[in-house]
Curated annotation (Swiss-Prot):
Disulfide bonds: 1-49, 15-64, 18-102, 26-80, 30-82, 85-92
Cellular compartment(s): Secreted
Protein name, entry field: Follitropin subunit beta
Glycosylation sites: 5, 22
Species assigned in the record: Aquarana catesbeiana (American bullfrog)
Assembly and oligomerization: Heterodimer. The active follitropin is a heterodimer composed of an alpha chain/CGA shared with other hormones and a unique beta chain/FSHB shown here.
Family: Belongs to the glycoprotein hormones subunit beta family.
């Protein structure tokens, strides 16, 4: 479980544009084990590679109307560890949209 470089796509529907930025996020493997069949009532905690600390960076999205805030702030991982996925701050699903997904049509 460690920091890795990634390109993510940021978008604001009101601006009609997507912007690619370089960031870091956590990826890799964490030690896991299956539940003991002799003691099924004891559940094992399965750790995921997640961030310990993040900072926030801001980028200006082009093409915004005057009445729209053109700035987009996004998290960048600074440190990683194996732990529980916090669904309050993290998308813990397997079927999330990819980091390069843009819902706006690109010419």
């Amino acid at each position: 479980c460690e920091l890795s470089n990634i390109t993510i796509v940021l978008e604001k529907e009101e601006c009609g544009a997507c912007v690619s930025v370089n960031a870091t996020w956590c990826s890799g493997y964490c030690y896991t084990k299956d539940a003991n069949l002799m003691y099924p009532q004891k559940s094992e905690k399965q750790g995921v590679c997640t961030y310990t600390e993040v900072i926030y960076e801001t980028v200006k999205i082009p093409g915004c109307a005057e009445n729209v805030n053109p700035f987009y702030t996004y998290p960048v991982a600074v440190d990683c560890h194996c732990g529980r996925c916090d669904s309050e701050t993290t998308d813990c699903t397997v079927r999330a949209l990819g980091p390069t997904y843009c819902s706006l049509s690109q010419d």
